[in-house]
């Protein structure tokens, strides 16, 4: 199960990075097109949809890598058992919140699929496609919260602490 989850997080991160590169590619294409005197319709629409995929698909990977912003001021002033309880509370709260968002994003994507909703803009892209990417990213993010919750519950450190420790020591 560990390998499957790690592959999911890594896969989402890779796909998010690919969409980030695609944003750069379509924007450069538009800039050079305008320089040469021809407009390219729909590039802004594509860049916006690629941004949705980049942002949501990268959430779980960056969380596991310890790249999300965390405020540890309170945790450092607690005893070790209190730190563990606070960590567990934050992880289960985050999992619940992300689960809520995942459910409603999936419901919205399903309704868009059923009704054939299309983007308003120069490119009438089916809305369930970017909404589906957002749902997949949120699902992976929810799983990463639950994954770390299970780890902390078993007495291990969460992935984001392990990742930042390795990086600080220059081994990452």
Language-model segments: residues:
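Alpha-helical transmembrane segments and membrane-interface helix-loop junctions
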Residues: 1-172
């Amino acid at each position: 199960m560990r390998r499957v989850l790690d592959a999911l997080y890594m896969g989402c991160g890779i796909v998010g990075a690919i969409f980030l590169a695609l944003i750069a590619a379509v924007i450069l294409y538009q800039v050079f097109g305008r320089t040469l005197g021809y407009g390219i319709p729909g590039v802004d629409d594509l860049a916006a949809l690629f941004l949705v995929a980049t942002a949501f698909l990268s959430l779980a990977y960056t969380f596991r890598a310890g790249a999300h912003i965390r405020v540890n001021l309170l945790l450092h002033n607690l005893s070790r058992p209190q730190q563990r309880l606070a960590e567990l509370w934050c992880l289960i709260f985050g999992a619940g919140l992300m689960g809520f968002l995942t459910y409603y994003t999936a419901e919205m994507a399903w309704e868009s699929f059923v009704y054939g909703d299309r983007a308003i803009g120069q490119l009438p892209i089916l809305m369930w496609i970017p909404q589906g990417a957002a749902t997949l990213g949120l699902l992976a993010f929810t799983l990463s919260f639950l994954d770390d919750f299970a780890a902390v519950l078993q007495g291990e450190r969460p992935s984001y602490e392990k990742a930042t420790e390795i990086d600080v020591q220059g081994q990452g």
